[in-house]
């Protein structure tokens, strides 16, 4: 990193001996998470990317649920966005079959370190995204108990970066990698139709996102002015 991350991290290490700074050459998200988990001394793991945020009660509430419901395999919460968007997501886990089609759990969930090690951690061959989705496909199964805290306690930063053809190609490549890696699981639930089903799901999701964006601007003054201008020009013609 060239943004002074090391200096900032070392300052926190000096302030609190519970912090540990571990340096590694950039090897991707999966490798960083695996190395961090290997160094962790606690029972539970919560991955957190540098540009995302947690409410201070998230960990407390997650661990409380594990304590009272030890059969739970994974805990997460509702989540919101900040940066270029400030809305909240209404997505929730609807079972393992739906998870195979689309990831409904964000990256900063809470799970046991022993379970992470049991399945071999995150896939370090993945460098183009969706690492957390592939991880959950291996971590969970049809019988797994997943609990969602009904509060937005995690916030994901939305950056002002437009999607492009290369990004779409990367996602398609990763989807195919995940499908080929877990072809037996997919065949059990969907046969060979999973990739077309996911394409359809993503199209529907994009449509719903567009509807939501339109609704947020429906009664804005500039929208009314725009339509007034358009109608005026049409009448002139």
What kind of feature is each model-predicted range?
Residues 1-7, 49:
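A conserved acidic beta->alpha catalytic loop
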Residues 95-177:
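Conserved nucleotide-sugar donor-binding catalytic segment
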């Amino acid at each position: 990193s060239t943004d002074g991350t090391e200096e900032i991290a070392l300052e926190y290490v000096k302030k609190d001996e519970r912090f540990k700074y571990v340096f590694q050459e950039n090897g991707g998200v999966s490798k960083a998470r695996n190395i961090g988990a290997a160094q962790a001394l606690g029972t539970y793991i919560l991955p957190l990317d540098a540009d995302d945020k947690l409410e201070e009660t998230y960990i407390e509430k997650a661990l409380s649920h594990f304590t009272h419901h030890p059969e739970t395999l994974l805990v997460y919460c509702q989540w919101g966005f900040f940066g270029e968007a400030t809305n909240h997501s209404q997505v929730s886990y609807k079972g393992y079959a739906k998870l195979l089609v689309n990831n409904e759990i964000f990256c900063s969930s809470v799970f046991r370190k022993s379970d992470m090690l049991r399945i071999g951690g995150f896939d370090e061959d993945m460098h183009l995204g969706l690492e957390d989705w592939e991880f959950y496909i291996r971590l969970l199964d049809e019988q797994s108990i997943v609990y969602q805290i009904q509060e937005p306690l995690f916030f994901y930063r939305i950056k002002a970066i437009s999607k492009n053809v290369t990004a779409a190609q990367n996602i398609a490549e990763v989807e195919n990698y995940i499908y080929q890696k877990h072809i037996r699981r997919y065949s059990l639930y969907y046969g060979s139709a999973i990739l077309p089903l996911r394409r359809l799901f993503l199209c529907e999701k994009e449509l719903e996102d567009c509807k939501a964006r339109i609704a947020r601007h429906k009664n804005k003054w500039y929208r009314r002015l725009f339509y007034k201008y358009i109608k005026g020009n049409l009448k002139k013609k």
